Amino acid sequence: MKNNYIPRDISWLSFNARVLQEANDPTVTLKDRIRFLGIFSNNLDEFFRVRVATLKRMVELIDKKKSLNIDILESPNLILDEIQKVVLKQQSEFNRIWNNINKELIKRKVVIINDKKLNLSQKIFVRNYFDDVVRPYIIPLMIENLPELPYLRDKSLYLAIVMRNKQNAYHEKFALIEIPSKSIGRFVILPSSKGTNAIILLEDIIKFNLPIIFSHFKFNHFDAHVFKITKDAEIDLDQEVGLNFVEKISKGVKNRRKGKPVRFVYDKEMNAELLDYLIQKLQLTRKSSIIPGGHIHNFRHFMDFPDVLVEKQERPKPFPHPAFRNKTQVSEVILKKDVMLHFPYHNYDPVIDMLREAAMDDDVISIKITAYRLASNSKVINALINAARNGKEVTVFLELKARFDEEANLEWKTLMEEEGVKVLVGIPNVKVHAKICIIQKRVQNKLVQYGFISTGNLNEKTARVYADHCLLTANKALLMEVNKVFTYLSNWQLGDKPIEKTKHLLISPISMRNSIIQLINEEIKFAKQGYPSQITVKLNSLSDQILLDQLHKAIKAGVKVNLIIRGILTLKEGMEKSKNPINAISIVDQYLEHARVMIFHNKGKEKVFISSADWMVRNLDHRIEVAVPILDVKIKKELIDIINIQLKDNQKARILDSDLNNNYVPSLRMKKVKSQVETHHYLIGKK
């Protein structure tokens, strides 16, 4: 590997392997094991739609002898070859795990029945269900004589069908049917004996009814297998000349349907002649990812598996933060002291309540907020619209380039503007990823401000499963600097200078990288002076070479470095094997570890930050991101305690090293520590 760094895409696949480990873990509830299979599948879909698509574009440019205006650590062709090897190996492991889970389901009297195993009453049910519910959505496509295939949807599941008469095997027809799972759902509960839950998949209902669908052909043999294609989903804004930014996004979303196939996944028992025909018509080449699999595909739907399993250990419900247990008005609390919410342990109510209260408070003048990914039927947007209706000045910076949320955000933009909300969108070549809010109100004839700075999205639904931190504050120094960010977001089109340098906040792309380097250098200096020195960083991903090199210098100087990285870590070979080895772990459990936290020992007077930014080039150089120092002593201790709990995890923590083995941290007969459970106990005991 060039520069001895692990390529980011190979590191990401190693992260997805950790998700697969959860599906394989017998200590995880069966319901969650199935959910993790769905997460693994959904993750891989997005990986191919974005990362593999990008690598394939690079290969095309190289083939055309065009230069790449991008720094990569390895040849795209070599990375694609390695991806194919890893994905095929993971697909085999996935199939093995699913077979084991299926056996466990049968033990629990949950049976997934295919079209060949229906009893008489189930056959009648499936026939009637097809006529009543499914048939209006079925559009058979006869394809054997077409010069090219009709449009096939990205992410949709298809049945590829060979029809023939047993008496004349040479007279065949090929057909395709799109499985309408988006319209009517993938899973159907069948009538079954008492105490048993029988489930059939929608594609098997369609298979059972193929003789009816194609009755006019008089065929008596049908061979049907599923496949799906994944398409390039990148939006190329530079190609849309003459359009404004919103029009470019809108057209880019529509153009996704024209994306080239980057992956073809199929049932390995598919008719060989039909398989070759599809590969030829889809213009798939040796560079394409053609992946054989089992009978079931699009496992992402299994994240919504029917609720037929009763589990002993259900996920604990979020609880109120102690500051809000007495239903006190949120603004009253924040104006007196800082509060930090830790999701999903704490409930999300204070964030929604803060906005709802502001919407109805006669003394509130304005609300400024950033939005990246929002919940459907968003309570946040509802509160902001209510505020605008009540005469408040509401400004929302809505990031239209949030990948796969572009269409939803365009709809939110239209809705909010119709209600009088000022919606700002689009800075060229920059995404606004910071999670910040400021509310201004009058208190006793004085203007005061309060708001929040968060690591997670304004999304009350994902807040139930994403582990994030949100600082509610009225600190004047912090909010004055947050205001500078909003001023820039509002006025950049007027040619305003970039955000001024700040004393407290670390802001990308202005100061964050240099500030982090300075903080690392301080620890190096302390180590050389003989002081205990330590850096602890928790991130989703760490792939920035400059900061990795800086950490390498810190290790050589004797600084203890702890990394808690959920996803990508492009570790330099040997960093974990040096005299002062790096301690790098990844925690994958029932909650998705989404928070970014930085702790610098600072001779015992720790400097602690929460941040919206990962340590990646895109976050540090091409996004507006905000990291905030934790100034409140109690909150600082609380956050350090939570991170220390995670560093002690010996149940769900994996060791991150350049071998990518994902070995679990050994418990070595010590007390078993499952950090998400321990964090729940720690926080629920707080007063």
Where are these regions (language model features)?
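A cross-kingdom feature strongest in bacterial/archaeal respiratory oxidoreductases
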Residues: L563-G567
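Low-complexity, intrinsically disordered short segments enriched for Gly/Pro and polybasic residues
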Residues: N377, I546-L547
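N-terminal localization/anchoring segments of enzymes in phospholipid and broader phosphate metabolism
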Residues: M1-I535, K553-A557, L569-K687
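Polyanion-binding catalytic cores of nucleic-acid enzymes and NTP/SAM-utilizing transferases
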Residues: L547, L551-K553
